Regions:
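Nucleic-acid endo/exonuclease domains
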Residues: 1-95, 99-120
Length: 120
């Protein structure tokens, strides 16, 4: 059984209820357009000390949707350290900016599908 901090799990549940517009858009498109086998994604999943936006456990694939605040130096350093920890644990992390999800959703979905299918 996983030992998850109760406060972190509670926060993840709240984040699932209050996703950003970009997260909702990506979630809808992933559910509609990605192949069903090997692509069961979970939203706002607790992995270690992190809450990731989307994760496909079977593929050890994490999808993060980043807003403008992630472009700040401090946030970028935090994201880099967090990504390194997840990668060290065997995960592959894909990051997309909000504007990519909102304006280039076909490209985003194609990139995710290519990773799942082993083309990237």
């Amino acid at each position: 059984m996983r030992d998850i901090d109760a406060a972190l799990e509670k926060r993840a549940r709240a984040m699932r209820r209050d996703m950003t517009k970009a997260e909702r858009r990506l979630w809808r498109h992933m559910r509609q357009r990605l192949p069903l086998e090997r692509t069961h994604f979970r939203r706002q999943l607790v992995i270690g000390a992190a809450i990731v936006d989307f994760a496909c456990v079977a593929n050890k694939l994490i999808i993060e949707v980043d807003g403008a605040q992630h472009g700040e130096d401090e946030a970028r350093a935090y994201d880099d350290a967090r990504t390194q920890a997840l990668v060290a644990d065997g995960w592959r992390v894909l990051r997309f900016w909000n504007f990519q999800v909102m304006d280039e959703i076909d490209s985003v979905i194609e990139t995710i599908a290519a990773v799942i299918e082993g083309r990237l």
